[in-house]
Amino acid sequence: MARVKRAVNAHKKRRVVLERAKGYRGQRSRLYRKAKEQLLHSFVYSYGDRRKKKGDFRRLWIQRINAASRANGLTYNRLIQGLKAAEVEVDRRMLAELAVSDANAFAALVNIAKAALPADTSAPAAAAAPKAAKVAPAAATATAVKAVVSEKPAIDGAVAADGDEAPEGYAIKGNAESKKYHVPGSTWYNTTAAEYWFSTVEAAKAAGFEPAGGEARQQIKN
């Protein structure tokens, strides 16, 4: 059987490795074994850094956008919130480029964001409308509770509150919005504004109220 020396293939393999390692210092660029070891490490570093590069550039863009937006009287967070509310689809890379190269265009975007921002700085513009719509269910709940208490025949031991003074024989407070009742001496009894008064726990439960904090908290102590 013929002998295979693989000289050509071996030399080519070494040339490729040394060509890739020619930028390294010392033996890492001249000796095949050292160059091969260093290349294995370099491949690991390059794989991880290609992914870190995305985060590094994102942080750089945010710093540039923040500096330019503060120069126009707006913070980075408020700028992004305003652009989203105005439905302006510009990514951070282009915003950073405009902040560096075109100050007038960036200032125009800041003005658009300012105009789209809600008056309430703690609430986004898109969520303001649904919150207003939630008022109606709360009012309907209070009306339903009032109907339960005042319907005929009336529930024994339940009266609507008229002022802060408790009627004689009625010591349990009822809150229509939360539909919870509070017995004297409980945690939130003194801070709760009574909308209904009940003479017994059973009367409060019959009106559709639940114990605030659970049964253990709402027990009348003799």
Curated annotation (Swiss-Prot):
Keyword ATP-binding set for record:
no
**Per the record's keyword annotation, is RNA-binding included, yes or no?**
yes
Pfam families assigned = Ribosomal_L20
| Source organism superkingdom | Bacteria
Q: Give the GO cellular component terms, alphabetically.
A: ribonucleoprotein complex; ribosome
Q: Name one GO molecular function term.
A: rRNA binding
Q: Keywords, A to Z?
A: Ribonucleoprotein, Ribosomal protein, RNA-binding, rRNA-binding
Which InterPro entries does the entry link to? Ribosomal_bL20 (IPR005813), RIBOSOMAL_L20_CS (IPR049946), Ribosomal_protein_bL20_C (IPR035566)
Q: GO terms for biological process?
A: ribosomal large subunit assembly; translation
Q: What does this protein do?
A: Binds directly to 23S ribosomal RNA and is necessary for the in vitro assembly process of the 50S ribosomal subunit. It is not involved in the protein synthesizing functions of that subunit.
* Family to which the UniProt record says this protein belongs: Belongs to the bacterial ribosomal protein bL20 family.
UniProt cross-references to NCBIfam families, sorted A to Z: rplT_bact (TIGR01032)
> Would you tell me the protein name for this molecule?
Large ribosomal subunit protein bL20
Organism of derivation? Paenarthrobacter aurescens (strain TC1)
